[in-house]
Regions:
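Basic nucleic-acid-binding interfaces
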Residues: 1-139
Length: 139
């Protein structure tokens, strides 16, 4: 297994927390170009690292992004996502606004919502069985 999927250590934790994040532009417009995506990937990677996380995979279509992330358990997922959206929006507005402004209305780039799911580890049924089968003390 690759190093990126191994256990990570924090100051007081050992963790393996992976998430699949999907971000969409406002109104799910088809706005992304290859040039934008080539610039967004290292920006997202750097932003994750600044917050103690890790960008493991980056993929996209014209109207949405897929990111596989490792986020430390001490970090708020909503704050983490907010930082990713904020820095990327700032970049896109600064460098590509002329290309996208006609496809969006108003001043916002990202939809206010996002989709995130935890991933990796054992299937839920296996974890459930493991927890159920713990030996409780008889006292």
């Amino acid at each position: 297994m690759q190093d990126e999927f191994n256990w990570r250590r924090g100051r007081t934790t050992v963790f393996k927390c992976f998430y699949h994040l999907v971000l969409t532009p406002k109104y799910r417009r088809d706005v992304f170009t290859n040039e934008m995506l080539d610039a967004l990937e290292p920006l997202m990677k750097e932003t994750c690292e600044q917050m103690g996380g890790e960008l493991l995979e980056f993929g996209a279509e014209g109207d949405h992004l897929h990111l596989m992330l490792s986020i430390p358990p001490a970090k708020s997922i909503s704050n983490f996502v907010g930082k990713l959206k904020g820095k990327s929006s700032y970049y896109l507005r600064k460098h590509h606004w002329e290309e996208v402004k006609n496809k969006l209305w108003g001043e916002h780039f990202w939809s206010p919502s996002y989709c995130i799911a935890s991933c990796g580890g054992a299937p839920l049924e296996i974890v459930k069985q493991y927890v159920e089968n713990q030996n409780r003390p008889s006292k």
